[in-house]
């Protein structure tokens, strides 16, 4: 990054988009999001599904990166279909930051299928085989099968979902007795 005078986002964008399908390499995915969850850049060569409209699953580490600005965070993410990905995320600042104007803080997520973990330097301290380290994620709340998710913000579109107005939880879509 410093050798070529590029930003973290530029490096992530380049390793994702400058791949030649005829040459071996790691198929990455990359996304950029703001703190409100809006995805403003998405590329997926790894096969992970990135939502086209709305935000992604709040369990993706691209969102938790906002809790530790500037620090690269690595995670093992497991989709509802069983596919595993290793993902890194880090915040970046955009804008000039003149007096009276704030800079924009964005988060950049970069990842690949877990089978490439040994070739991805940021995952050397992750135990890919340890199921306890896996973070269960989905694409987005409206398409996710994880009905017991404590971070569910919307009911699933593809399943009947009963809301009990007499039950209190972290959200009207989550019962505290079933949340994980």
Give residue ranges: language-model regions.
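Conserved binding/catalytic microenvironments
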Residues: 1-147, 151-180
């Amino acid at each position: 990054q410093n050798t070529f005078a590029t930003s973290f986002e530029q490096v992530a964008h380049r390793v994702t988009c400058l791949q030649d399908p005829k040459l071996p390499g790691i198929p990455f995915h990359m996304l950029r999001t703001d703190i409100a969850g809006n995805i403003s850049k998405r590329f997926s060569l790894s096969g992970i599904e990135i939502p086209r409209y709305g935000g992604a699953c709040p369990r993706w580490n691209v969102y938790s990166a906002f809790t530790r600005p500037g620090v690269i965070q690595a995670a093992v993410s497991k989709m509802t279909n069983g596919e595993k990905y290793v993902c890194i995320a880090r915040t970046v600042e955009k804008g000039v930051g003149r007096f009276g104007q704030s800079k924009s803080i964005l988060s950049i997520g970069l990842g690949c299928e877990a089978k490439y973990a040994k070739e991805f330097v940021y995952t050397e301290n992750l135990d890919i085989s340890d199921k306890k380290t896996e973070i269960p994620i989905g694409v987005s709340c409206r398409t996710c099968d994880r009905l017991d998710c404590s971070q569910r913000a919307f009911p699933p579109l593809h399943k009947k979902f009963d809301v009990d107005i007499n039950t209190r939880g972290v959200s009207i879509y989550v019962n505290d007795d079933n949340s994980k």
